[in-house]
Amino acid sequence: MSNLCQEITLPTDPLTHIDGEGEIALCILSAINVGKLKSFDEMEELCDLAVRGLEELIDYQQYPVKAAEASTINRRSLGVGYIGLAHYLAKQGCMYDSPETVKVVHELTESFQYNLLKASNNIAKEKGPCGYFDRTKYAEGILPIDTYKKDVDELVAPEYNYDWETLRTDIRAHGLRHSTLSAQMPSESSSVVSNATNGIEPPRGYLPVQKSKKGPLKQIVPQYNTLKSSYTLLWDMPDNTGYINVVAVMQKFFDQAISGNWSYNPSNYENNEVPVSVMAGDFLNTYKYGWKTSYYQRSERA
């Protein structure tokens, strides 16, 4: 389990001494700027670079606590996610609540997870599987496309563009170098460095302000001049339905979790008050469509 962000869902085991035999979960994170993606032909190389780079960090870094070192070295858990999803959708001409958006996200995330798994499988062929591979569902030949909440099929048909059965066979034969591959972090700060939209979130405006210890930072959304009319702005969304569906389709493929949010603009409701029934409905829909975790429940000032 994680402390603040909610995307990490790794096993832990209590310890009573700093050098005890328990298990402290660590996850090595990275994100791919999908807003820069030109075609799915690039995804294989991008995922391979991300996985190989994080693979080297696991052995390179120092661990002050044995329980963290043993877990990380043996599980080699990675959490690769997205930044720039709003930019990517704007390039496709898709609003978050448009019916075609879930299909676009389905195709993107299938390519993403498939190529992450393929990269880890290739490294396992070179170096061997991770030490605790036999403790994973992957070792049984079980993939995320087998275990997702089937209610997602109401949103988008379970049609695939990649050869999952051959990948399943390769994983059972050679294993994976990493026990997990994907997790969606909030990425508020890292998106700024890459001049990308924040993670999987719709931007708050065309010129959102990122607060930091050194003061506010204004940053215009990518390709503002050409894509202004194609962006979904957070506080213009009438409700959370489209966003909930996007996250649900992503979670179908991710093997860890997603730090998803619920956002409310009080001006959309009578007396500037968000009804409890609306919030309860969002909670139930996230469960129905297979969200594993949620992060913030936030509102715009009325």
What are these regions (language model features)?
Residues 1-302:
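Long, C-terminal-biased catalytic regions of enzyme "large/alpha" subunits
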